[in-house]
Every structure is written in structure tokens, then in C-alpha cells.
Amino acid sequence: MVMESGRTSAYGNNTNVDFTQSTDDDPLIDGPLVSQDALESAIKREFQTLSTHWAVGVLSFLHVVYVVVCIVITVFCWISDEHTSECTAALNGIDSKTVVLLGKVALWVVVFIYDRVVQRRHSAVRRKGYLDFYRMTKGIKSLPLLIHSAGNAAILTVIAPSSLLDANVKNLSVYLLLAIICLELLLTIICLLRYTVHVVKFNRKKPHPDVTEEERSYGCSSDAHTETGFRDGSSLEDVVEKQADLIDYLKQHNSVLSRRILTLTGQQIRA
């Protein structure tokens, strides 16, 4: 019994020694602790504005220019025959209908590029933790591309039977084409204005990430919900989507914090 207790004691002592040595050999534990002020200054994130206003401005300008050009070409070169020679010289012999349709295709490409740029900027906002703003503008930021895609389908529907339409009413297809183009402009401008209002409010408010805002509201309110994402009237799909976004954001945020803590610790050890 004495020998067994001695072995047990020796084994326990060896375990303690090994644990102490492994702890002492760890440079992160043996090194100086990171001060709270240094850590907060290092992990503090400055708010970065969502700069999509230039894309909205470019799209709006090009869209207005296209509609004006279409109206001028349609009135002077398509409906009227008085300026046929001038139109032929100005368009280098290209048919006015072809110019309008090629311009529509080019405008759709511009709208598609705009949609990709805005989607990329909003994905960056989502990764930074502004999940409510991302979901609030998720639909409206994609409406211009949807409007122009539907407009293209409507234009094809009018152009294909244009001879039949013009046989019943003179230049009916031209008037319908202009109506579709002008309606596209009206709906697109409305969507862009609403989207711009949301972006301007977001940039002026300069909010913290949603996790930080909910922690503050929970700390100030005694009857706050204890689980992130649950609100009165929220559907299960919205709750699951928000919690999934929060998990992705927190994973990325934790990895960033870990790298910064290691960097600060290494700097203090070298100092």
C-alpha cells in the first residue's frame, strides 16, 4: 500500500510538473497581458459609408439620355418622313428601329453592371454585421434589373407583331414602344430614389453592427428578448435567416479579433 501510494504521489507530482512546464513554456501566457485600452483601440471599427450613390447617378443619367434619344429618333426619324435624309446621315445609314433596340440592349447591360456593383457593396455591408439594413434593401436594390428585364420582354412582344399592329392603327407599335420605355424610366427612377433615401439615412445614422445594437437595447430594456432574431410578428424563415447571418458574422468577427489579439501580444513581447 505504501509503495502504491508512493507511485500515485510520484505520478501526481509528475503531472503537476508537466502541466506547470507546459504553462510556463507558452509565450502568450508568460508574456505581458494586453491592456484593455490597447485592445479596444485595436478592435474598434470605424463606420464606413455605403458608397453606391455614384452608381445610382450614372445609371439615372444614362437612362434619361437613352429615353431622350429614343424620343428624338422616334419622332423625327421613325414617325415623320420629313427628315429622312438628315436621319440617314446622322445614323450612318442604320435603321432608326435598330438604333433604338441596340441602345436598349446596351442600357440593360449597364443596369446589369449596376446591379452587380450594388450587390457586391451590400454583401460587404452584410459581412460587417448590418443585417437589418441588408434585408431591408434586399428587394429594392434589385428592382431596376427586374424592371428592365420585364421591359425587354414587353418590347419583344410589341416588336414581333409590329406589322400586324401597324396595319390596324398607324404607328401603334411605335407608340407602345415609347410607352414601355418611358414607363421603365419612371419606375426605375422611383426605385432608385427610394433606394437612395435608405442609403442616405444609413450613412447619416452611422449605426453599429446589429449585434452591438441589440446588446445595448437588451442592456437598457428589462423586458428585451433573450434570443437574437425573435421579434413579435417575425416569421420562422426570417428568424432562421437572421440567426444564420449572425452566426457567419460572429465567426468572421471572432477570427479577426483573434488575429488582432495575437498581433498585440506579439508586439508587447518583442517590446
From Swiss-Prot:
Signal peptide start-end: none
Location(s), subcellular: Lysosome membrane; Late endosome
Membrane topology reported for the UniProt record: Multi-pass membrane protein
Disulfide linkage: none
Sequence segments annotated as region (Disordered): 209-234
Membrane spanning stretches: 56-76, 93-113, 145-165, 172-192
Cellular component terms per the entry's GO annotation: late endosome; lysosomal membrane
Keyword annotations from UniProtKB, A to Z: Endosome, Lysosome, Membrane, Transmembrane, Transmembrane helix
Subunit description: Homodimer.
Family per similarity comment: Belongs to the TMEM192 family.
Protein name: Transmembrane protein 192
Name of the encoding gene: tmem192
